[in-house]
């Protein structure tokens, strides 16, 4: 299994002005691609912080996906921060420049617009089907680094276009949830651990939906990775069957 790290960049996210839906989308995308999302980082539009985030991410993950900070303004410095992290310089990428010129037909390519074509030589531009700034796909020491715009519709479109580039073999993910009523989370906690011991490779997580001591209700999420979707699905279904059986036993004992 390969590990992934998600980085989001932007003062507006840290201040709470913008809800960080990008991190959720990227995390979900990578999980269903078969990656284990190990770490999420959110940093300011600050060169040192961005550089630190990429260094940390490359220490922890096989694939790193960032969003935010690819535009033409003074505080769009994600690519510069990545270059600093790997000890590289940004250079004008002609393919990226051509993509930008295509977007700005009959409009002057100012230094601010040309900035969006600057990147380290280890990166190649990815055409943005929605906005103007290209995404970047970079390869550093056997790791993939994907740098995406922060505008959600642009980020999503670019990430979807890179699905094949980010595919991995022999790692598939499957999950399923069930609802249980009438059992408190603290009561069911030992059975969650028991199922994880009984079915190798599954992860079981309980999510309380109501106030525990008043009207207990649980959503039980079961997930697994395996070499195929069917193998992961089989593990999850086995675990769910055991969870249902334990829940029925607990509820039956309460009725007696």
Curated annotation (Swiss-Prot):
Alphabetical list of InterPro entries matching this protein: CinA, CinA_Arc, MoaB/Mog-like_dom_sf, MoaB/Mog_dom
Pfam families membership: MoCF_biosynth (PF00994)
Family: Belongs to the CinA family.
PANTHER family: NICOTINAMIDE-NUCLEOTIDE AMIDOHYDROLASE PNCC, NMN AMIDOHYDROLASE-LIKE PROTEIN YFAY
Protein name: Protein TV0584
Biological source species: Thermoplasma volcanium (strain ATCC 51530 / DSM 4299 / JCM 9571 / NBRC 15438 / GSS1)
Organism lineage: Archaea, Methanobacteriati, Thermoplasmatota, Thermoplasmata, Thermoplasmatales
């Amino acid at each position: 299994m390969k590990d992934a790290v998600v980085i989001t960049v932007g003062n507006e996210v840290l201040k709470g002005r913008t809800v960080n839906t990008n991190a959720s989308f990227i995390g979900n995308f990578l999980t269903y691609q078969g990656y284990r999302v190990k770490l999420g980082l959110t940093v300011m539009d600050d060169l040192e912080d961005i550089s630190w985030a990429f260094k940390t991410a490359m220490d922890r993950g096989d694939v790193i996906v960032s969003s935010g900070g690819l535009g033409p303004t003074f505080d769009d410095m994600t690519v510069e921060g990545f270059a600093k992290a790997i000890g590289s310089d940004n250079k004008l990428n002609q393919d990226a420049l051509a993509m930008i010129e295509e977007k700005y037909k009959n409009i002057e390519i100012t230094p601010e617009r040309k900035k969006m074509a600057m990147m380290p030589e280890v990166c190649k531009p990815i055409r943005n089907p929605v906005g103007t700034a290209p995404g970047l796909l970079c390869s550093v020491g056997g790791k993939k680094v994907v740098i995406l715009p922060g505008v959600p519709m642009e980020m999503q479109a670019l990430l979807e276009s890179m699905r094949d580039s980010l595919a991995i073999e022999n790692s598939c993910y499957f999950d399923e949830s069930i609802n249980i009523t009438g059992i408190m989370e603290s009561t069911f906690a030992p059975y969650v651990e028991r199922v994880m011991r009984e079915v190798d490779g599954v992860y079981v997580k309980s999510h309380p939906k109501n106030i525990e001591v008043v009207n207990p209700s649980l959503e039980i999420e079961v997930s697994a990775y395996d070499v195929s979707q069917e193998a992961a699905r089989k593990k999850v279904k086995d675990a769910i069957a055991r969870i249902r059986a334990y829940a029925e036993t607990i509820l039956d004992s309460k009725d007696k």
